């Protein structure tokens, strides 16, 4: 990437101290409306060698936010233990013009399973169930 202009450089970023930055839009269709962005302090940026990329065995995505809960489903695989799954439509982007990022999830803890099961009737009744997740 750095020496070959035809390849994109690979860069590893380490972020810390996340915070929300609220502001009022000063132009565009939503001028005068409140909005916010998520910012972070850049702790480190370093080139990532392609050989190191090939040695990565586990990709880790750590995220938190709010979103709508949908499609709760009990799954009983033939060769494994049954589990509860659901979809989270995570909100992303400006508050006035949100976009959605969809995550199909396995509900991992008994506490979370209890909470999701409490919402099943509302979801089946076409009510929106907004959740916070991390």
Label each PLM-derived region with a short phrase:
Residues 1-134:
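Single-stranded nucleic acid-binding surfaces, predominantly the OB-fold ssDNA-binding core
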């Amino acid at each position: 990437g750095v020496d070959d202009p035809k390849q994109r450089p690979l860069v590893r970023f380490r972020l810390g101290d996340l915070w929300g930055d609220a502001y009022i839009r000063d132009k565009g269709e939503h001028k005068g409306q409140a909005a916010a962005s998520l910012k972070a302090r850049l702790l480190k940026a370093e080139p990532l060698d392609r050989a190191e990329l090939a040695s990565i065995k586990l990709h880790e995505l750590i995220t938190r936010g709010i979103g709508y809960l949908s499609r709760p489903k009990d799954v009983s695989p033939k060769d494994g233990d049954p589990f509860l799954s659901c979809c989270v439509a995570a909100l992303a982007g400006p508050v006035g013009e949100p976009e959605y990022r969809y995550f199909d999830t396995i509900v991992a803890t008994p506490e979370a399973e209890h909470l999701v099961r409490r919402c099943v009737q509302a979801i089946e009744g076409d009510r929106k169930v907004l959740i916070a997740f991390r």
